[in-house]
């Protein structure tokens, strides 16, 4: 039971221009379909999603299924993951991208035209408020606390034992 431990990468390249209905099958140029070096996740936002079959399903050394079962389940896992991702992105990617665009545009508009002017206005008014607050504190709160402190400082306790 020779278990294959190497991962293989299989790619299918199809080119509508290279396939002629009259002259037979011609092979597509793989360089035409090769990724142009463009990383779709340059900031590694979804690095946690890079899972393989061994990360999800693992058999300990003491319990192994038949090699053919392991190989077939590995193939079905990879195919179903690939097909379901493509299927879901066909139906969900465009509507969700549209909704995310609307959400981010709304939040950007609110931030630019409402939140930041409000914050800047508050920061402009704060020195005046700080001066008024200091005057109120000096005129009302400080004398009140001083008088309460003097009242409590004259209190004395005497303990007697009967």
Curated annotation (Swiss-Prot):
| Keyword Transferase included in the entry's annotation | no
Q: Which residues carry this modification: Phosphotyrosine?
A: 19, 27
According to Swiss-Prot or TrEMBL, what is its membrane topology?
Peripheral membrane protein
Q: Which UniProt keywords apply?
A: Cell membrane, Cytoplasm, Golgi apparatus, Membrane, Nucleus, Phosphoprotein
| Entry-annotated residues carrying Phosphoserine | 20, 23, 36
Q: How does it assemble?
A: Monomer or homodimer. Interacts with CAV1; the interaction forms a stable heterooligomeric complex that is required for targeting to lipid rafts and for caveolae formation. Tyrosine phosphorylated forms do not form heterooligomers with the Tyr-19-phosphorylated form existing as a monomer or dimer, and the Tyr-27-form as a monomer only. Interacts (tyrosine phosphorylated form) with the SH2 domain-containing proteins, RASA1, NCK1 and SRC. Interacts (tyrosine phosphorylated form) with INSR, the interaction (Tyr-27-phosphorylated form) is increased on insulin stimulation.
Q: What is this protein called?
A: Caveolin-2
